[in-house]
């Protein structure tokens, strides 16, 4: 996971967002909320996501909203797009999902 130092921070999550890593990711993700009015989460390097990872993203959204901050999901990987489509969650997060063809 990598956080940039831009005006609006971008938090890049790499690797798996599964039950095996959500404990590790939760603290970093929740700590990043509130460092700026908007937090962007870059999901381009997420290789696998399960319901625990989805729940973490939902929690982050709820925490950001409760504190009056914006949370944006960006650059959804194929694994994230597949999970969002399966669970019909694209509308829940409200972020545009751009599907990039595999090279």
Where are these regions (language model features)?
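STAS-like cytosolic regulatory interaction modules
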Residues: 1-49, 59-103
């Amino acid at each position: 996971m990598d956080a940039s130092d831009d005006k609006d921070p971008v938090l890049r999550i790499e690797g798996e967002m599964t039950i095996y890593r959500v404990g590790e990711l939760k603290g970093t993700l929740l700590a990043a909320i509130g460092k700026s009015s908007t937090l962007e989460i870059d999901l381009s390097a997420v290789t696998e996501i399960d319901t625990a990872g989805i729940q973490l993203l939902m929690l982050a959204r709820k925490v950001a909203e409760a504190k009056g901050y914006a949370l944006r999901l960006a650059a959804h990987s194929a694994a994230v797009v597949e999970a969002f489509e399966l669970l019909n969650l694209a509308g829940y997060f409200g972020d545009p999902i751009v599907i990039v063809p595999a090279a």
